[in-house]
Structure formats: C-alpha cells, structure tokens
Regions:
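Bacterial Sec-dependent N-terminal signal peptides
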Residues: 1-24
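Serine-esterase "nucleophile elbow" of acetyl-processing enzymes
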Residues: 22-103
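Cell-envelope and extracellular/periplasmic
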Residues: 78-82, 109-110, 114, 118-119
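Conserved, well-ordered alpha-helix/loop/beta-strand core segments that scaffold catalytic motifs
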Residues: 106-110, 130-131, 145-147
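Extracytoplasmic/secreted cell-surface and envelope-processing proteins
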Residues: 114-119, 123, 154-158
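Charged helix-capping and loop-helix junction motifs
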Residues: 122-131, 165-171
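A short helix->loop->beta-strand "cap" motif at the edges of active sites that frequently abuts
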Residues: 140-143, 184
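Catalytic His-Asp segment of secreted/periplasmic serine-dependent ester chemistry enzymes
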Residues: 151-234
C-alpha cells in the first residue's frame, strides 16, 4: 500500500511539473497572443500576396499607430509581441508565420536581445536564431525579408546596457553581410531612422528618448522602405 501511495505521489508530482513547464513555455513564447486571430484568419485567396511581419513592440505597435497603412494593405499582417526577443520569435514562428501560409515574412530582429529581456546577450546566438527562422521559412516555401534593428541609444528599462548602439551596429552588420551572401532582401531601417549625430533614433521619428519606439512619422519612413523591399520580390 505504501509503495502504491509513493508511486501515486510521484506521478502527481511529475504531472504537476510537466503542467507547470508547459505553462511556463507557453507564457514565455506567448502562443496565446495570436492563437484566436490565427484560427479566424482565412487561407490566402488565389492571387493574394500575404505578408507577415514578425517582431517585437516596434511591430506590435505599428497597427495601432498607423491603422490606415494596414487598411490600405490588408495583405500585410502584424505578428509582433512587445518585449520579445529572437528566442521567442523562433519558438512561435511555426504558429504565427508558417501556419498562416504567407508568401513573404519580414523579420525585424534584435532590439530586445540587446536589452537583455530574456537573459545575457550573445550576438552569435541571436544571429543563429535569425538564420533558423530563415531556414524554417524557406523550407516552407516562404520568401524572407530581413529588417535591421532600429537605432537604440539606450534602454530606459535597462540602464546597465551602456553600449546599445555599438551592439546594434555590430548585429546589423553581421546579418546584412549574411543576407547579401544568401541573396535575401534586407531593409536598412537603421540608417533611415538614425539621428544626425548618430547617437540615437532621430527624435522626430521617436515616441521617447532615447528613441526605441517609432511614432507615426517614423512608421511612415519604415512603410516606404518596406513597400520598396516587397515590390522587388513581386
């Protein structure tokens, strides 16, 4: 009887641990954020050129800040989640990109990795995460556009990161060189959004200082570059 009781207790503890881990994994990737929207999204119609934007708060805030852009381009679908890093993008890439059957995915990477949002920053690992997303997309017949990390003079929520701009430049250079080698279109948001002194996001394009999040004017700059890049793929 004692042995059965011990086995029962062990099973309960194991099940609790598995459930806890599952909840932790789900909350880390935030699969629930777009689960309902993904289910309700119809399959692309014949001739529809669906584009999915994968990213963080910069992508997440875009439809709220510039809803008219998405009304004019209903084929462009945002799948950004505020605060997320490339590690989380990779976890939810199948659910929030591949399952939507887009023709193109645009990946805006890096900001929150550098801001240490999910742990210590490792440029090579962030780069590898980007490469893995590209591999998954291409294996599923999805074209890829890589979009640079935007200028970041610092992070208000992470003051200990004192070399943000140097890290942004280094990561962008690495991804851009690889994109050129692989003939993957690359959008240089960084240069277009940089301040005149090269130290931060242009204040005219930012909602905050140091600039991390674009305002409506900043998104309009990004929209022009995005449409140019997409136009080259059609």
């Amino acid at each position: 009887m004692n042995q059965i009781k011990k086995l029962t207790m062990a099973f309960v503890m194991m099940a609790t641990t598995l459930q806890s881990n599952a909840q932790t994994h789900d909350s880390f990737a935030n699969f629930a954020r777009y689960a309902s929207a993904n289910e309700q999204l119809a399959e692309p119609k014949e001739g529809e050129w669906r584009v999915v934007l994968m990213g963080n708060s910069i992508t997440d805030n875009w439809p709220q800040t510039r809803p008219e852009f998405f009304r004019e381009h209903p084929n462009i679908i945002g799948r950004g989640i505020s605060g997320q890093t490339s590690y989380q993008f990779l976890l939810r890439f199948r659910q929030d990109v591949v399952s939507l059957h887009p023709a193109v995915v645009v990946i805006n990477y890096g900001t929150n990795d550098i801001a240490l949002n999910t742990g210590p920053y490792d440029e090579k690992q962030t780069f590898d995460n980007v490469c893995s997303m590209v591999d998954i997309a291409q294996a599923n017949g999805i074209k890829v556009v890589l979009a640079s990390c935007l200028p970041a003079g610092g992070f208000g929520w992470r003051p200990e990161v004192t070399d943000a701009m140097q890290k942004v430049k280094s990561l962008n250079a690495r991804v851009r060189a690889w994109a050129k080698e692989k003939r993957i279109p690359y959008i240089d948001y960084f240069s277009a959004m940089l301040s005149a002194d090269g130290k931060e996001m242009n204040p005219a394009y930012a909602t905050d200082r140091p600039g991390i999040h674009p305002n409506a004017a900043g998104y309009q700059v990004m929209e022009r570059l995005l449409l140019e890049a997409l136009g080259q793929l059609r």
